[in-house]
């Protein structure tokens, strides 16, 4: 039958191999090597438990004025964060490869006394820096606003009243309330009373620690039981979080990968443009005997227009828009460049508890009974009777049982006596009387092997119970036995309940989707090996699991070998996850996978996860993570579960597609422009077609037209961050050779069509060739010089915008994905402005280049010249798109530059075996430990409790010390 499942925080059940807390350590446990984190904790604990004179006396509360004075003295209660001044952001926008080229052009124009052109270039420089500064500030404000939603609060006694305030403004001497369910907002001393504190996020200890006035709860821990008043002793960098700063500094902050890519693209385009423009400059001096001034002016203007001035601005805007989109999916981005890295993730190292699982223990449907009339419902009622069912639960086990049992049925009984859980007996017991029949009986619930020793028919059911225990243990499922006395006072086994922290309903499907999207998932947990194996089986992950003793032992996290990936990569790739790991193992696992060639994402929630989060390409702090984990992470989840991470990947891939289409377009536009003027300078010169104008011996545009093209294009490109795209089905990585090839194909068609129109225009302009020109065949009058210049301006401008629509769909036709309304409207507006400017341009001579509007004319045919240019551009746009698709088909067929290869680690993966040695490496054995294998080989004939005794001293077996839950953990025989 189905029963109500109760959800319980699984942190209390998760088994981790180590404790650094203030609680008493189990004496049998061998002392493990001390990590960097352990040293930080020890140093902090020494200070916290030092002489009483080092600590403030119990506080009775502060006034607002006192708190403000102390805040000025001690600073805010938060991790220090470096912020770039606003003015420095603006100054940076005025310097760099792109701005430097523009400054050179401005200086040259002013040196040549071209004041209007120099002023235009200077205005563009200032406008570019201002827009870049504004977009950067806006993106930073968006991230800061999202971060503010993560700020913790604290209940503090100020001005003679309790109030809720931002934990960041706490100061030493504040009186705070530490209550069940709340986070400890700072390092506090307890004034009076005791509380149970969960320090798992700080120390790895899975069991709550009981703390009194002699202890100091640390910021980042959580109160799980009780309520006390405490005095704030340390805040900000003086807390344990400050003590872990040295560990986090072992990972240097890498420059975002996207900035490296942008620099490469900018330098490549600048180099190409500079070389071609210098060739034009030299040729003009030699061929046309142009003055140094005119030749230099032409070369500089073409160079300035060809370089992508707004490249970083558009990318920053696109990433900022992506971060807002991610926030709608419950993902807060703390570093914009992480979005680009997330799109290339092909390896996800995920926590088990809370991410893959519900982080809630549940009673399962499977229930084993030994007498007729007993079932899951009746067994749950008996288990609830062995507790105070109408009082707040005393422990995690009672909480789980009472949440699943029918408490109304329990009210039919009166509890005469109750014995709470005792770590020695490992069970609870109660004496009850049935209000309906008056029958008096005892009930008990506890560890299966303990209850088995109590029942009167142990010999009859021993083998059956042992088989059940072994089968459940082999699957990593915990179990709880319930027994009841009969009228003779004999104990009868009522049933065996099973419980575990189940997977989230969507986890299995999410992992399947992840693999379909090219992302491998590795589970990392501090839990027992058997529990990890069972979870992998339930989630269709490889149940082959590595434990901590199989991993390489690294002494210093600051000095990791550079050959980890080569030596141990195959071993780690061949398994489905890692169990019984320590915090530094996570750090090493991530580094090994990165060295193996994978783009690795890591999820974590505690201070001890912070180094691994920092080391990963993308660190993800899961829902409920500590401030230290959030500070180290690139992304913070505000909703639990793995599905949120997959959504982050898909949204990031959408952002990547937008940046890819923009870079492809920007490279194409640059190549189209510079190659057009380069070829036109050498082969299609007005002089060769009879031009006698000394200022029109070679074809060029006035600076104003160049700048109009630049401003309209860059303005339209600001909307590309909102474009519609389809995310890739595989991880994305930058393949710049392929990007340049794709852009070159688009540029070649656009440039070729522009050169052809220039040739047609020059023939229509020339008195010598007009009779055989297309202008004559179409019934158009001979083309004036001014209209030839304006026509080519319109052609180049239209081709630029149409190329944008081709570049955004990759290897598909331009209509494969409709553009977003904002991008479409931006392009239409820019095209209308260009068309209107070209049609009604005032007849003038800017920069001594004659210009004239295309719509000015005597006949209707002449007035329709802009329409002919549009038709010409659209026809060639279709040709460009067909050529693009065919080129992509050919590139995919030959896998040009690995364009269809997966973004995965390199090299084959060898199957893993227990005795696997990689390059001579053999896992280091821990000394003086009783292995699980030895305990598992004990004979069951002496009873399951004998076999279980051998497991009690093993550090990797679930802790049996004091927890009423861990007493029912899986133990198996070989």
UniProtKB/Swiss-Prot annotation:
Its EC number is 7.1.2.1. GO terms for biological process: proton export across plasma membrane. Residues 1-23 have a biased composition (Basic and acidic residues). GO terms for molecular function: ATP binding; ATP hydrolysis activity; P-type proton-exporting transporter activity. The keyword Translocase applies. Keywords: ATP-binding, Hydrogen ion transport, Ion transport, Magnesium, Membrane, Nucleotide-binding, Phosphoprotein, Translocase, Transmembrane, Transmembrane helix, Transport. It is found in: Membrane. It catalyses: ATP + H2O + H(+)(in) = ADP + phosphate + 2 H(+)(out). The chain crosses the membrane at residues 93-112, 118-137, 265-286, 295-321, 631-651, 662-684, 698-712, 738-761, 813-840, 869-887. Its main location: membrane. It is a multi-pass membrane protein. Disulfide bonds: none annotated. PROSITE patterns: ATPASE_E1_E2 (PS00154). It comes from the Eukaryota. Residues 1-61, 952-974 are annotated as: Disordered. The active site is at residue 351. It is an enzyme of class 7 (translocase). GO terms for cellular component: membrane. SUPFAM superfamilies: Calcium ATPase, transduction domain A, Calcium ATPase, transmembrane domain M, HAD-like, Metal cation-transporting ATPase, ATP-binding domain N. The keyword Nucleotide-binding applies. Belongs to the cation transport ATPase (P-type) (TC 3.A.3) family. Type IIIA subfamily. This is Probable proton ATPase 1B. The lineage of its organism: Eukaryota, Discoba, Euglenozoa, Kinetoplastea, Metakinetoplastina.
